[in-house]
Amino acid sequence: MLNNNIVKRKNLSVIVLAFMVFVLAIVGFGCGTRTTVQLNNIPGTILNDGLAITNNTQWAWTNVQLTVNGSYNYSMEEINPQQTVNIVAKDFTHNGQSLDPSLLGAGTMLTGRCALPNNREGVFFIVWH
């Protein structure tokens, strides 16, 4: 009987510990640095921030999930994770021709230029999927 109570307590301890780890993982993930961006006034959230150094300049390569008429896998240069950026696409091109990204089929990649803070321009690409 005593051994049975010890086993039950150990099992309860393991369950409580697992639950605490689960809660901490959710809280930690939710509190991570996230940037709100807008592409042509469509809100999105930056995920999986990455950084590469090119020619002594920092370029932030970031994936954004946009959920308008489907979802975009969106990457762009020079986004500060601490700020909110309104990205206004100046043009979309595909095989050298401008087009509307809402008309794309799956797997189509767009590239384009966009306005960034401080009167800078950025380059982005979007893969529709």
Regions picked out by a protein language model, each given a short descriptive name:
Residues 51-58:
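Asparagine-centered strand-capping/turn motif at beta-strand->loop junctions
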Residues 45-50, 103:
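Short, solvent-exposed loop/turn segments enriched in Ser/Thr/Gly
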Residues 92-129:
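Terminal connector regions
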Residues 60-67:
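Short, hydrophobic/aromatic beta-strand segments
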Residues 70-102:
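Intrinsically disordered, low-complexity Pro/Gly/Ser/Thr-rich segments with frequent PxxP/GP/PP motifs
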Residues 29-33:
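N-terminal Sec signal peptide cleavage junction
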Residues 4-18:
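Bacterial N-terminal signal peptides that target proteins for export
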Residues 17-27:
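Bacterial N-terminal signal peptides
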